[in-house]
Design a protein with these regions (language model features):
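Intrinsic low-complexity/IDR segments
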Residues: 1-350
Length: 350
C-alpha cells in the first residue's frame, strides 16, 4: 500500500498532473460550497441570491486560467521531452557513426596488413625459395597458391587488383608458364578497370561482378572462369580464351572479342551490343536472350550455338557459320548482312 501511495505521489508531482489535480480540487470545493449554501440557506454566504449566470461568470475566469495554464505546461513539457529525445537520438547517431568509422578504419588496417604480409611472403618465396624456377610438383608452389587463395577473400575490391597485378608483373600467372594456379580464386567484384592482364592465366577464377571495363586481356586464358555479371565494356579480349566461361548477364558492349575462343561459353542475357566478334569461335555457345545488336559477327563460328531470343538487329553476320544454330528466320532478317553466311540448314546465303 505504501508503495502504491508513493507511486501515486510521484505521478502527481509532474507539472501537468499537478495543475490538473489542483483544478479539479478547486472546482469540487466550489461545487460543494455552492451546494451546501443552497441546501442549508447560508444567507451569510450570499449564495442563495446568486443565479446560474452569476456562478458561470464567477467561475469562467479561474477555469479558463487553469485550463490555459494546464495546456501551456503540457505543451512545454511535451516540447522539452521531444527535444530531449532528439538530443539523445542525435548523440546515439553520432556515437554509432564514430564507432562505425573506427570499425572501418580498423578493418581497412587489417586488410592493408594482410596485403603487405602476403606480398612480403611471396617476395620471400621468389627470392629465397626460387618460386619462379620451381616445378609443378614442388611444395613451394603449393604454398604460394594456398597463400594467394587464403588472402583474397580477406581483401577489398581494390586490394584484390593489387594482388593480381603483383602476380602478373612478377611473371607468376603467365600463359604457358603459370606458377600460381588461380583456379577458384576469389576475385569477385574486383576493381580491375583498365588493368593490364595481357596473356594472364586466369582459368577457373571467380571474377563474377568484377569491374573489367577497358581492361587489357588480349591473349589471356579465362577458360572456365566465372564472369557472371562482370563489366567488360570496351575491354580488349582479342584472341582471348573464354571457352566454357560463364559470361551470363555480363556487359561486353563495344568489347573487342575478335578471334576470341568462346566455344561452349554461357552468354545468356549478356550485352554484346556493338561488340567486335569477327572471326570469333562461338560454337556451342549459349547466347539465348543476348543483346547482339550492331555487333560484328563477320566470319564468326556460331555452329550449334543457341541464339534463342537473341537480338540480332543491325548485326553483321557476313561469312558467319550458323550451321545447326538455334535461331529463327525472323531474328536473322534483322541482321544487316548475311552475305556468304552458312545458314542453320547448312545452306549458303547468297
Amino acid at each position: 500500500m505504501v508503495a502504491g501511495f508513493r507511486s501515486w505521489w510521484e505521478n502527481i508531482r509532474k507539472p501537468r498532473d499537478a495543475v490538473l489535480i489542483t483544478l479539479l480540487v478547486v472546482l469540487i470545493t466550489l461545487f460543494v460550497v455552492i451546494l451546501l449554501g443552497y441546501t442549508f440557506h447560508w444567507d451569510w454566504t450570499g449564495l442563495s441570491q446568486k443565479t446560474l449566470w452569476d456562478w458561470l461568470q464567477l467561475l469562467i475566469i479561474p477555469v479558463v486560467l487553469a485550463v490555459g495554464g494546464y495546456l501551456f505546461i503540457y505543451t512545454a513539457s511535451r516540447n522539452e521531452q521531444r527535444a530531449t529525445e532528439q538530443r539523445a537520438q542525435s548523440e546515439r547517431d553520432a556515437a554509432e557513426k564514430r564507432a562505425q568509422t573506427e570499425r572501418d578504419i580498423a578493418l581497412d588496417n587489417q586488410r592493408e596488413t594482410a596485403l603487405q604480409s602476403y606480398i612480403d611472403k611471396l617476395a620471400e618465396l621468389l627470392l629465397h625459395e626460387k618460386l619462379r624456377e620451381s616445378k609443378p610438383e614442388d611444395e613451394v608452389r603449393k604454398i604460394g597458391r594456398v597463400r594467394t587463395l587464403t588472402v583474397l577473400p580477406r581483401l577489398d575490391n581494390e586490394r584484390k587488383k593489387s594482388v593480381l597485378q603483383f602476380l602478373h608483373e612478377s611473371g607468376l600467372i603467365d600463359i604457358g608458364m603459370s606458377i600460381i594456379d588461380l583456379d577458384g580464386a576469389d576475385l569477385s567484384k574486383a576493381h580491375l578497370r583498365v588493368a593490364n592482364l595481357y596473356r594472364a592465366d586466369l582459368r577457373g577464377a571467380d571474377l563474377s561482378e568484377a569491374y573489367l571495363s577497358w581492361a587489357k586481356l588480349g591473349g589471356a586464358d579465362l577458360g572456365g572462369a566465372n564472369l557472371r555479371r562482370a563489366n567488360l565494356g570496351r575491354a580488349n579480349l582479342s584472341e582471348t580464351h573464354l571457352n566454357r566461361a560463364d559470361l551470363s548477364e555480363g556487359d561486353l558492349s563495344k568489347a573487342n572479342l575478335s578471334k576470341a575462343n568462346l566455344s561452349g561459353a554461357i552468354l545468356g542475357g549478356a550485352n554484346l551490343s556493338e561488340a567486335d566478334l569477327s572471326r570469333a569461335n562461338l560454337s556451342g555457345a549459349i547466347l539465348s536472350g543476348a543483346n547482339l545488336s550492331e555487333a560484328d559477327l563477320g566470319g564468326a563460328d556460331l555452329s550449334e550455338a543457341d541464339l534463342g531470343g537473341a537480338d540480332l538487329s543491325g548485326a553483321d553476320l557476313g561469312g558467319a557459320s550458323l550451321s545447326g544454330a538455334i535461331v529463327t528466320p525472323e531474328q536473322l532478317n534483322r541482321a544487316i548482312s548475311l552475305q556468304d553466311a552458312i545458314m542453320p540448314d547448312w545452306s549458303k546465303h547468297p
